């Protein structure tokens, strides 16, 4: 396992760059997942725009204005934070940056680097605005298509997704949270997928309504994108060993063609530092492995969800009713997660004598919601007048 990129580069390339301790493997793959998802979503929204499913919105903006004081101060602040914390990882003593997460949330940093980066960012903003300055600023009308807003959609999904994932993890582990609330809030660990999905979905719904983006067509474009992003994000879970593994599986591998680490795995050097000491490990951290191998469920989800992405990607041009792809996504997502929960470690709930996990409850609701939505959309399509196109919002 590689808790962060420092250990990955040390093992794979043979270099020891201390600043790479700052980049968690899980966070790295989540970032890659968001970037790839944004690219796929842009391509799909552009395709739908060419087919006439989306229309642009117009907005007026002032051009040719010089940089305002708020522009300069905001960029100075961003540059200062980057220099004070991130650049400091390169130049401060190793003892100060040995634990990157603790360092980021501490008051430690480099004032000279912060001020220098702040001045650089502020200067670049002033130069950029001054270069575009007109003798007389003017108001122009611009047309913005949905695919032009993918950057904003991605940021909204990231912010609300992470917040929702953290909140749902806190609810799922409420007793542990009460014992050490600060650790839970500021830790990079502990993220619940469905919490992120629900909160991000609500935020994107509000954004689409605000900017008059066809809701069902947007969801159809998001469906394969989210499945692909989830698959790629689970690579981070597997590589870092963040605790999202399965139940114990001490049985020997019965399949000669299947690698042993696919059948069961003990997650050495896992980021949660769970398990027993690894013989011969001399690192200060991440020197544990599980005493009994478990099902590597993140790896299974990487494979299964990528296959489901291919299914959705194939169907997106075959199904013409707006919302069908999204409904199928809900059903496939719910089914996949419900099945994987059977071999996953989770805290069970107590509901009327039954003990499902939070993910099993939500995945069941997702499947039923997807099924109900599909049937409703099909009935709506049947009763729609032939000359009247089905509304997409």
Description of each model-found segment:
Residues 1-393:
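Hydrophobic, membrane-interfacing alpha helices
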């Amino acid at each position: 396992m590689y808790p962060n990129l420092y250990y990955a580069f040390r093992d794979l390339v043979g270099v020891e760059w201390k600043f790479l301790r700052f980049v968690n493997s899980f966070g790295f793959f989540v970032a890659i997942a968001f970037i790839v998802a944004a690219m796929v979503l842009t391509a799909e929204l552009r395709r739908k725009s060419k087919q006439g499913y989306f229309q642009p919105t117009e907005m007026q903006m002032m051009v040719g204005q010089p940089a305002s004081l708020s522009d300069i101060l905001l960029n100075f602040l961003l540059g200062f934070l980057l220099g004070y914390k991130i650049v400091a990882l390169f130049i401060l003593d190793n003892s100060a940056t040995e634990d990157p997460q603790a360092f980021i949330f501490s008051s430690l940093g480099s004032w000279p680097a912060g001020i220098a980066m702040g001045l650089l960012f502020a200067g670049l903003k002033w130069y950029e605005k001054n270069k575009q300055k007109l003798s007389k600023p003017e108001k122009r009308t611009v047309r913005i298509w949905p695919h032009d807003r993918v950057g904003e959609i991605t940021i909204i999904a990231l912010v609300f997704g992470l917040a929702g994932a953290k909140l749902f993890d806190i609810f799922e582990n409420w007793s542990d949270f009460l014992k050490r609330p600060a650790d839970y809030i500021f830790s990079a660990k502990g993220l619940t997928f469905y919490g992120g999905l629900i909160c991000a979905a609500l935020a994107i719904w509000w954004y689409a309504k605000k900017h008059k983006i066809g809701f069902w067509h947007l969801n159809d474009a998001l469906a394969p994108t989210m499945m692909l992003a989830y698959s790629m994000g689970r690579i981070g879970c597997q590589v870092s060993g963040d605790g999202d593994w399965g139940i114990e599986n001490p049985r020997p591998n019965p399949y000669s063609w299947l690698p042993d680490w696919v059948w069961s795995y003990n997650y050495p050097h896992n980021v949660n530092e769970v398990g027993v000491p690894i013989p011969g490990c001399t690192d200060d951290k991440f020197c544990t492995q599980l005493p009994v191998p478990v099902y590597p469920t993140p790896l299974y989800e990487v494979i299964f969800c990528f296959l489901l992405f291919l299914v959705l990607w194939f169907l997106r041009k075959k199904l013409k009713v707006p919302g069908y792809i999204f409904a199928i996504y809900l059903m496939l997502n719910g089914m996949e997660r419900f099945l994987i929960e059977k071999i996953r470690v989770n805290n069970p709930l107590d509901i009327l004598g039954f003990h499902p996990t939070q993910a099993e409850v939500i995945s069941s609701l997702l499947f039923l919601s997807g099924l109900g939505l599909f049937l409703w959309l099909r009935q709506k399509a049947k009763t729609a007048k032939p000359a009247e196109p089905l509304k997409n919002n």
